[in-house]
Amino acid sequence: MTNLPQGWEVKKLEEIANIKGGKRLPKGENLLDNNTKFTYIRVADFQDNGTINLQNIKFINENTYNVLKNYKIYDDNLYISIAGTIGKSGIIPKELNGAILTENAVKLEYIQNNISNKFMYFFTLSNIFKTQIQTSTKIVAQPKLAITRLKQIQIPLPPLKEQERIVGILDESFAKIDESIKILEQNLLNLDELMQSALQKAFNPLKDNAKENYKLPQSWEWKSLEEISENISAGGDKPKNCTESKTAKNQIPVYANGVNNNGLVGYTDKATIIKPSLTISARGTIGFVCIRKEPYFPIVRLISLIPCENILCLHYLYFCLNFFIAKGEGSSIPQLTIPKFKSLQIPLPPLKEQEQIAKHLDFVFEKTKALKELYTKELKDYEELKQSLLNKAFKGEL
C-alpha cells in the first residue's frame, strides 16, 4: 500500500476500531423459532449483499438474552464472519439493533467518528482485504480467523469527506452493476424454464395433466425400460490395473457415478460395455445421464443401458431420462436400483419420430447451452468490474 494520495494513511484495524467477538449460546440453551423479541444472529443469516436475511431469523429467551447482553451488535457496527465462511461482512439493519451476535463473527466499534461504516464495508469486499485475511486464516476442519490477526489487517484510509465521496461513487456504480446482474440471473432462470418447457412438450405433447401414464398421441405407447433395452446392468468393482491416465495397454475409459469429467476415473485394458449405450448414476448425483459411444468399463453405482436399436433411439432416451428421472425422483431417493430402473415407464413414439424429437431437443439445448455460457461469462465480467472499482477506490484512483 504505497503511493497513496496526500492525506491518506495506512492503519491497522485495531487502530481505528475495537474488534469484539460474539458469543455462543450457554450449554443446554437452544435457538427458538418463535419471536421472543430477543434476536440471535448467526453466520447463516449473513447475506451476500451485506445485510441480514430476516426470513429464517432465530430468537432466544429473555434469560439467555440477559446472560449474553454484553455481546449485542448495533446498526452502526460492521460485522465480519471469522469461522467457516471467513470474511462475510455487512451492516446490521435497524430492526435488528441490539441483537446478540454469534461467536463465529466479530463487530467493529469505531474509536473515532471519522470512519464511514459503508466505506469499511466496501473495504471488506475488496481483494486487498480478502488477500490479507486468507494469509491470516488458520486452515483446520473449520477455517478460523483469530481476532488477534484480524486486528493487524491494514486499510488505506482517506479523510472522512473522501471516504464519503468514494462511497457515493461505489454505491451508484454497484447499484447499476447489480441491476445488470439481476437481469442476467433472471435470463439464466428463463433458460432453465425454456429447457424444461421443451422437454415437457416433447414427452407430453397432448399436455395431459395426469401424473403417471398420461394420454399419448396415436402410435405412441408406454414402455418399461426393460422392454426396450438389450441389456441393463450395474457396474462392477474398479479394475485392479486401473491407471489415472492412458497407457500403451490401458486405453479403455473407466466410469463411475460422478459428475466431474462425466464420471471418468481412469483407464483399463478391457471393456465390459462394447455397444453404444447410456449410463445413469445410481447414487450420489442420482439421475446424472451420459451417452457413451465408445467401449468402456462401468464401476459400482453406475447403471448401463444398451438400447434395442430397432425400436429405441439412444439420444431420445437421453433426453427422456433427463426429464423423467432428473426432474422427478432424482433428488428424493437415496439410490436408484436396477429393478426400479428397469420398471421405469417412458412414452415411446415410432423410431423416426424419436429421432426427430431428439434432433429438435439437441438444437434447443445447444442454443441454451451457448446462451448460458455467455450469460455466465457476463456475470463473471461484472464481478471483475466490481473488484476493479474497489481496487481503484482503495488505491485512491477513483
Predicted feature residues:
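Non-catalytic DNA-recognition/assembly elements of restriction-modification systems
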Residues: 1-24, 152-167, 187, 197, ...
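A short glycine-rich beta-alpha junction/loop motif
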Residues: 6-9, 82-85, 98-106, 115-118, ...
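Sequence-specific dsDNA recognition surfaces
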Residues: 14-30, 45-75, 95, 226-275, ...
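Short, ligand-facing micro-motifs at secondary-structure edges
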Residues: 47-59, 78-81, 85-102, 118-122, ...
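Short, solvent-exposed loop/turn positions at domain surfaces
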Residues: 66-67, 139, 214, 267, ...
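Short amphipathic alpha-helical coiled-coil/interface segments
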Residues: 170, 191-199, 361, 382-387
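Contiguous mid-protein beta-loop-alpha structural module that forms a pocket-lining wall or clamp
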Residues: 176-183, 190-191
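Acidic, low-complexity, intrinsically disordered peripheral segments
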Residues: 389-398
